[in-house]
Amino acid sequence: MTTAPCVPNASSVARLSGRIQAGIPLAPLTTFRVGGKAEWYCEPHNNLELQQCLAWARAQGIPVTLLGAGSNLLISDAGLPGLVIHTRRLRGMQLLEGGRIWAAAGEPLVNLARAAAKRGWSGLEWAIGIPGTLGGAVVMNAGAHGRAMSDVLVEVQILDEEQEPCRLEPVDLQFGYRRSRLQDSPWTVTGATLQLLPGRDPAQVQRQTQRHLNQRLSSQPYHLPSCGSVFRNPETHPAGWLIEQVGLKGYRIGGAQISERHANFILNCGQASANDIYRLICLAQEKVYQRWSIFLEPEVRILGSFDDPLIS
């Protein structure tokens, strides 16, 4: 979805009422708390503004990066070229009949899980500890405790490559483990509709939701900035176990450390750079592959330029 970059002209920026800004730091907008600046940045407040921003970027011939909660991203210290669109203003939720929930792409997933539990609708208990937005969760097919977004999704609303609104069904999205067709498409998710199981005891659903949250908090390190799970789990063994077996649990490069509690987490211990984290990712891949010939595929989205390539 990119062509040769050019310099956006002042009049085209002005037509978007000053909503597009230059040189905005991205580190505060990610859970890793690292990364450089966005060349151009905007926070649309509705789908019309989103369409305008996408059309502007297309007219300028610059790439677009969508940013939700920033919980599954590693952004280069050099920052990102083109336009970064933050979806945190694109929020809203509707509890429909029969256990259906519609929400906008920027709505935090935890809000949906809590609203469903309060209503006595089962099916999102697992999502309570996932620090992402609905849009990002759909794109990544986020999941936990053996469940995933593809289990509850009935429809996704998108803007296609022409910025026209479309509706897609799960069969259109080629879901897999932490995968969907949306990851490699030029489409922009604007909202989604989920189907849950209504009529349950709200207190029981809320207790189960809280149990999932307690389990997550007890087994995973949330006291320092991280992206969540760094690698997808191979079919043979969990990624964290493989990393621990090659002696990297607690290993540190610069300000970044492979967690001593859960080796599939990398922590920013205070002054980490994106490159520190990236080097730990490369090291974990290298050591695991050397020992077992198992390729650890990153679950975290790695954006921007880094010096050394990952194993592929």
Curated annotation (Swiss-Prot):
Catalytic residues, chain numbering? R178, S229 (proton donor), E299
The yes or no answer to whether the keyword Mitochondrion is present is no
GO cellular component, as recorded: cytosol
Where in the cell?
Cytoplasm
- Known EC number: 1.3.1.98
Principal localization reads: cytoplasm
- What are the FAD-binding PCMH-type domain coordinates in residue numbering? 33-199
Q: Does the keyword Kinase apply?
A: no
Q: Specify the pathway.
A: Cell wall biogenesis; peptidoglycan biosynthesis
Function as written in the Swiss-Prot or TrEMBL entry: Cell wall formation.
Q: What is this protein called?
A: UDP-N-acetylenolpyruvoylglucosamine reductase
Species: Synechococcus sp. (strain JA-3-3Ab)
